[in-house]
Amino acid sequence: MKPAFCALALIPLLLAGCATPPSAQAPMSSAAEASAQTALDERISYYANAYDVPESLIHRSILRESGYNPTAHVGPYWGLMQIRLDTARSMGFRGSARDLLDADTNLKYAVAYLSNAYVVAGRNPDHAIRLYASGYFWEARRKGLLDRLRTAQADEPPAN
């Protein structure tokens, strides 16, 4: 029994050798990080204008949902704004769940959804964040706003 226990105790040590040492992992340079952040900010600005949502609200949602990690995947939630596949589909998305890990794709459908939450919330950012996280359908129905909800199917900015 002792030899088997000793062998089991060595497994974590052997597996530790398989890990890439931190020094071998190439960190992103500060210039590359700045460039990536600038590109992301440009896309956020684009979708904020396209869907009439404050950029600050989009940034707040991204920080809350993924901490600006476009490859975040927790349970049924995907990407930068942690949108569910079925929710993205309700906004017109036709791809696979993994496609939502692309930041631009994620923003296109998640900001459309956030835009609806913002309208239903009476343009109150705090309420919009809550509705984004919990869903807005029943409140939109109660307020008679279902006909004002939009999708992201068109490449053109939605009409108001």
Residues covered by each model-derived region:
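Catalytic and binding regions of secreted/periplasmic enzymes and modules that target cell-wall glycans
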Residues: 111-150
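Bacterial Sec signal peptide processing site at the extreme N-terminus
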Residues: 12-36
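Bacterial N-terminal signal peptides that target proteins for export
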Residues: 1-8
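Substrate-binding/active-site groove segments that recognize
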Residues: 76-93
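Export/targeting segments at the very N-terminus of extracytoplasmic proteins
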Residues: 28-63
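Short, functionally critical alpha-helical segments immediately adjacent to catalytic or ligand/cofactor-binding
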Residues: 53-68, 110, 129-133
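Second-shell loop/turn segments in exported
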Residues: 29-34, 44-48, 69-77, 94-103, ...
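Solvent-exposed loop/turn segments at secondary-structure junctions
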Residues: 66-69, 87-89, 135-138
